[in-house]
């Protein structure tokens, strides 16, 4: 697992102490600027969380009999979204408020890509869909190779 440090100033003594602490509990340390951190976290954390909230909200607004069956027959993907959507709403409200510029940038990129996928489905562009799905599958393989797959459990720190 990683710990990202975004130093406000270049106080080497402070950075050394912080790095030492996080390394002592088995984390790999990365240092990056706050702006870069915000963009990375927007894509890897904040947008997936927002998508989960949106999908679960959409499901909750379906007609009662459909909503009940969505819940009853939840597949793994939907259950993963409900896990995310079950997170602390106050914390996430604050995350989106504090990181709004990076979130809006990445959300714009995501919605453009989603619209492109919607168009491909509408036009039955199976070649584009397969190409897109294959390239995203490669990203998953890289994540697995790096040992970053699966859910985060603090008790797993340092385990592969």
Predicted regions span which residues?
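Internal alpha-helical scaffold of NAD(P)-dependent oxidoreductase catalytic cores
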Residues: 1-83
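Interdomain hinge/lid region at the active-site interface
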Residues: 67-136
């Amino acid at each position: 697992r990683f710990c990202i440090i975004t130093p406000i100033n270049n106080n080497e003594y402070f950075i050394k102490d912080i790095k030492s602490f996080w390394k002592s509990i088995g984390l790999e340390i990365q240092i990056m600027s706050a702006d870069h951190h915000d963009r990375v976290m927007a894509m890897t954390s904040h947008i997936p969380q927002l998508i989960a909230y949106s999908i679960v909200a959409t499901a909750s607004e379906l007609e009662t009999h459909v909503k009940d069956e969505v819940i009853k027959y939840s597949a793994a993907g939907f259950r993963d979204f409900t896990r995310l959507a079950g997170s602390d709403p106050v914390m996430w409200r604050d995350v989106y408020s504090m990181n709004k510029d990076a979130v809006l940038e990445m959300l714009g990129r995501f919605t453009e890509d989603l619209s492109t996928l919607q168009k491909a489905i509408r036009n039955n562009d199976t070649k584009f869909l397969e190409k897109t799905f294959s390239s995203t599958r490669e990203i998953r393989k890289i994540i697995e190779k790096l040992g970053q797959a699966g859910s985060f459990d603090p008790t797993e720190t340092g385990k592969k």
